C-alpha cells in the first residue's frame, strides 16, 4: 500500500515486486533501507528521523553496489548495451526539523566549485510523513497515517513527562484508540525501546 500511495498506482499482486536488499532493523513496521524492483524500476525507500543532507551521497554508494550485483560483469565488455533498472530514491522523513511536504536533495549540492551543469546527479525525494503533512499520501496508506499519529503523541507527552513514561503512555493510548493497535500490542516492549532510542537520537 505504501508503494501504491507514493506512486498513485493500484498494484495488488505481491509477486510483481522483487525485493533486492534489506538492511538494518524493522522499526515501527516500516523496513529501513528497502530496495525493490517494480516494472523495471529500482526503488530505494529509506526512513529518517533526523534531517540528513548527505542522503544523495549515501544513496550513490548504495545504488552502485546494487548495480554491481545485478549486472553480469562480463557483459560490460560486449558491444551490446547492458540495460539496468531506472533508480528512484524516496526518503520518508519524520524528524522535528521543519521541512515542506515534499522536497529534493541533490548530489550536486555537495560538489565543490561546481560550474555549469553537473556531470553526475542523484536526486532524493524527501516526503514529510509527520502528522499534518502529505494528507493525500496518508489517506492512501493508513499505516503511515497511524504511524505519524503515534510519533506525534510521543513528542507531545515527552514535552511534559519523562521520555520513558511518555512513550508508554502514547503506546497505551494508541492501542485503546485503535491506532496501530495490533502492531503495538504484539510488539509493545520492542516499540517502547526503539521509540526511546529514536527520540534520543533525534535530540542529539
Language-model segments: residues:
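Elongated, amphipathic alpha-helical interaction scaffolds
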Residues: 1-204
